[in-house]
């Protein structure tokens, strides 16, 4: 579960290191976001010569959460960190590589580009 002010890690090679959620998209009263949801993030820390700079605001897709995701068979998949992939205004990934595993739920959400770039799909 991601909400405003949640600290996040970047799971791509866009150049961002640390991000913070500034808005959960999808309605004015929506408080939490989970895997497969799109949020607004601000870059808090970035590497030099990266595609993104500190202070910039982007859309981001949540790919891993510590809360995890519950499957229909009752299993629960949890991760060690909260990670996102930065997206441009057309909701295409900014980076060209994805680091770490992603879940099958992204396939249902029609983010096939991110699923195909990921090294492992759980």
Swiss-Prot record:
<keyword id="KW-0699">rRNA-binding</keyword>
<comment type="function">
    <text>Binds to 23S rRNA. Forms part of two intersubunit bridges in the 70S ribosome.</text>
</comment>
<comment type="subunit">
    <text>Part of the 50S ribosomal subunit. Forms a cluster with proteins L3 and L19. In the 70S ribosome, L14 and L19 interact and together make contacts with the 16S rRNA in bridges B5 and B8.</text>
</comment>
<keyword id="KW-0689">Ribosomal protein</keyword>
<keyword id="KW-0687">Ribonucleoprotein</keyword>
<dbReference type="GO" id="GO:0006412">
    <property type="term" value="P:translation"/>
</dbReference>
<dbReference type="InterPro" id="IPR000218">
    <property type="entry name" value="Ribosomal_uL14"/>
</dbReference>
<dbReference type="InterPro" id="IPR036853">
    <property type="entry name" value="Ribosomal_uL14_sf"/>
</dbReference>
<comment type="similarity">
    <text>Belongs to the universal ribosomal protein uL14 family.</text>
</comment>
<protein>
    <recommendedName>
        <fullName>Large ribosomal subunit protein uL14</fullName>
    </recommendedName>
</protein>
<dbReference type="InterPro" id="IPR019972">
    <property type="entry name" value="Ribosomal_uL14_CS"/>
</dbReference>
<dbReference type="GO" id="GO:0022625">
    <property type="term" value="C:cytosolic large ribosomal subunit"/>
</dbReference>
<dbReference type="GO" id="GO:0070180">
    <property type="term" value="F:large ribosomal subunit rRNA binding"/>
</dbReference>
<dbReference type="InterPro" id="IPR005745">
    <property type="entry name" value="Ribosomal_uL14_bac-type"/>
</dbReference>
<dbReference type="Pfam" id="PF00238">
    <property type="entry name" value="Ribosomal_L14"/>
</dbReference>
<dbReference type="GO" id="GO:0003735">
    <property type="term" value="F:structural constituent of ribosome"/>
</dbReference>
<keyword id="KW-0694">RNA-binding</keyword>
């Amino acid at each position: 579960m991601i909400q405003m002010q949640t600290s996040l890690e970047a799971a791509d090679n866009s150049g961002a290191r640390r991000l913070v959620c500034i808005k959960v998209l999808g309605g004015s009263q929506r408080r939490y976001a989970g895997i497969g949801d799109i949020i607004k993030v601000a870059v808090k820390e970035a590497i030099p010569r990266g595609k993104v700079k500190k202070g910039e605001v982007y859309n981001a897709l949540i790919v891993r959460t510590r809360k995890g995701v519950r499957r229909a068979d009752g299993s629960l998949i949890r991760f060690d960190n909260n990670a996102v992939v930065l997206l441009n205004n057309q909701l295409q990934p900014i980076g060209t590589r994805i680091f770490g595993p992603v879940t099958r739920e992204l396939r249902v959400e029609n983010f096939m580009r991110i699923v195909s770039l990921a090294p492992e799909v759980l």
